[in-house]
């Protein structure tokens, strides 16, 4: 479920790969993904959990993966 905090059109393949690494390889929580993205790309959302979830959903979908299945969740 998305919360409209991220416009999927703004997520590049490079950003999606970085988000995937944080979530899937480094086991970041949605809050940690949100904070890392805010720090790296500049966002006022900070560690907002809904923002982190939306980033993961947008990234997974761009990569052709299901954001609610392994390895995302």
What are these regions (language model features)?
Residues 1-16, 69-73:
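Basic, amphipathic alpha-helix used for nucleic-acid engagement in HTH/winged-helix/SANT-Myb modules
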Residues 6, 11, 28, 45-46, ...:
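Short coil/turn linker and secondary-structure boundary residues
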Residues 11-28:
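Short, amphipathic alpha-helical "recognition" segments used to contact nucleic acids or chromatin
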Residues 22, 26, 40-44, 62-67:
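Short, flexible helical or helix-coil boundary motifs
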Residues 33-36:
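Short alpha-helical "recognition helix" segments of helix-turn-helix
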Residues 38-59:
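Short, basic interhelical loop/turn and adjoining N-cap
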Residues 55-73:
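Short Lys/Arg-enriched helix C-cap and helix-to-coil transition segments
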């Amino acid at each position: 479920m998305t919360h409209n905090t991220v416009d999927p059109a703004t997520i590049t393949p490079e950003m999606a790969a970085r988000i995937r690494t944080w979530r899937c390889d480094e086991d970041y929580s949605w809050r940690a993904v949100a904070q890392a993205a805010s720090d790296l790309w500049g966002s006022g959302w900070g560690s907002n959990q809904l923002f982190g979830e939306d980033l993961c959903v947008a990234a997974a979908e761009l990569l052709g993966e299901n954001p609610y299945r392994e390895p995302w969740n």
